[in-house]
Design a protein with these regions (language model features):
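Alpha-helical transmembrane segments of multi-pass small-molecule/ion transporters
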Residues: 1-305
């Protein structure tokens, strides 16, 4: 299956679930307060379990070198993303925290996993886990403090000891020591972790119900953030890592992951911190639509280099 078809399929699936969430909100089935409670379930239970369960897989020493390269390249990419977002998005802007967060963090799981699997198979997915691991560490430290607009030590400790960050390190220990959960417990936790994508889409759809679509489309910063997230960042990052002696597949996996649309985590953080979840939903929705054009283009450019 071609990259374009895989991307289009994932976007359609995502928007169908999002529309269900929007309908539930319009009909009063999900209230504003209810959506806040759902976001807590997603952030503090479902997402950590998804991270932990991703490490319940077979260890392969043959692929360890590629995985280490993926960690390094992913770290460079995130470093570039954070630096550029800080430089290009002024702190004087009233919603700079939402814009910076949306510019850095991508939907690398739901879009990235099926896309990478369709192009590079299971080996590509293994390399993607490095990017997703760093995503979860950074989104719960840098991302958390960016959205909360707090840099104090107490906030850092709270972010660094969040369930998702703990899940990363516990999952890595289980993976390296090849500790497997009993079948019944594994199946039970897998069912809960599988809720991550539909639950996140329902939350985003419910938040989108509060959005003035016509007003949103007139916001030039929405397009600027999307252009940065979908095209500028991945190209700049790829140019920086292009000459490193890493396997080409690893470079492409990191490129595609960084070029995925805006993460839904921003909407859930915005709900928790009483920011503007509607604006985050706008970033998510528009970037997801535009990624149907930009992702194939970025992928082709990467393959040509």
């Amino acid at each position: 299956m071609g990259a374009g078809v895989v991307i289009l399929k994932q976007i359609v699936i995502m928007f169908i679930i999002l529309l269900i969430g929007l309908w539930c909100s319009l009909k009063g089935l999900i209230t504003k307060e209810g959506n806040k409670q759902l976001s807590k379930v997603a952030l503090y239970i479902v997402n950590p379990l998804l991270i932990f369960m991703s490490y319940q897989s077979e260890y392969s020493s043959k692929l360890l070198k590629g995985l280490m390269w993926s960690f390094l390249l992913s770290g460079i990419t995130f470093g570039v993303a954070i630096a550029l977002s800080t430089l290009l998005i002024s702190k004087k802007r009233p919603e700079h925290s939402l814009e910076r967060f949306s510019a850095v963090y991508s939907n690398c799981g739901f879009i990235g996993i099926p896309l990478i699997r369709g192009i590079y198979g299971d080996e590509g997915v293994l390399y993607l886990t490095a990017y997703i691991t760093l995503f979860n560490i950074l989104v719960w430290t840098h991302g958390y403090m960016t959205m909360k607009e707090s840099r104090d030590f107490k906030s850092f400790i709270k972010a660094a000891t969040s369930p998702s960050v703990i899940a990363v390190f516990v999952g890595l220990i289980f993976y390296l020591m090849q500790i497997r959960l009993p079948e019944i417990l594994h199946t039970s936790l897998q069912y809960v972790s599988d809720m991550n994508t539909p639950l996140a889409m329902l939350i985003a759809g419910s938040a989108a119900a509060q959005t003035n679509v016509l007003k949103a489309l007139k916001n030039k910063w929405l397009y600027m953030v999307c252009a940065y997230k979908l095209f500028l960042l991945p190209i700049v990052a790829f140019a920086l890592v292009h000459f490193l002696p890493a396997p080409h597949m690893v470079k492409m996996v990191v490129l595609i992951a960084s070029a995925c649309p805006v993460a839904t985590t921003g909407t859930m953080f915005a709900i928790q911190f009483d920011k503007n979840p509607e604006r985050c939903s706008e970033f998510f929705a528009v970037s997801t639509l535009l990624s149907g054009l930009t992702l194939p283009l970025v992928t082709m450019l990467g393959e040509m280099l």
